[in-house]
Amino acid sequence: MFLAGFWVIAGFIPPPAPKLTGEQLGQLFTQHAVRIRIGMIVSLFASALLASWSAAITIVMLRMRGRVGALAYTNLAVGALFVLEFIISLIIWQSMTYRSRDPQVLLAMNDTAWFLFVCITSTPMLQTFAIGTAIFLDTQDGHPDPIFPRWAGYLNYWVAVLFTPGTIAVFFHDGPFAWNGLFTWYLPLTVFAIWMITMSVLMLKTGGALEAGAQAYSAGTDLADEVRQLRAEVARLAAGRKEARL
């Protein structure tokens, strides 16, 4: 949904080059104002769903073995911050289409939006590090039934590492480390998509397993209750017969 709004509708992939002048940037946002507005609206709705996704991951993490509580709530907190970073950037781009502005103001707004979108790597890095560490704690000592497979922990660690190049985009106006470059845009974007899809699939599988386990536990609990009730009934009948004999 986010890619539909950001890429297909708004046309922000590939991103506007950092070397564009204020006049060129103003012309771009004026010519495509309607599609950018609509694309940003769709992207805003999609960005909000990241909060629910982070909450779902947190619930799953709280079921893991080991002391993962702090890691789970860290994931929830930085997931919420991640949503804000997306939303603020999208609102800035929307406001650039709202009225005619000085070219230098447009440049400053666009720079700020892209730095928010690309350069703040600390939150996704901390989120993936927290998830990966929790997975390793859950799978240590050869636990037979981990929530997520151990390789998912390595995936999260690698994702954290591959997000790192975006941090230095502020030093470059062109090349692979600019905000539209290979290492700061296309690589993290691809990695982010793979990570989201992989973790979502793992959550769906885990959800089914946890639900089946909960149903089995519930069935076992119901059976135990029935056995206790049956024993109580047998004891009551035995006591009644004993009194009748007396």
Tell what function each PLM region has.
Residues M1-A238, E243-L246:
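Hydrophobic, aromatic-enriched alpha-helical segments typical of multi-pass transmembrane helices
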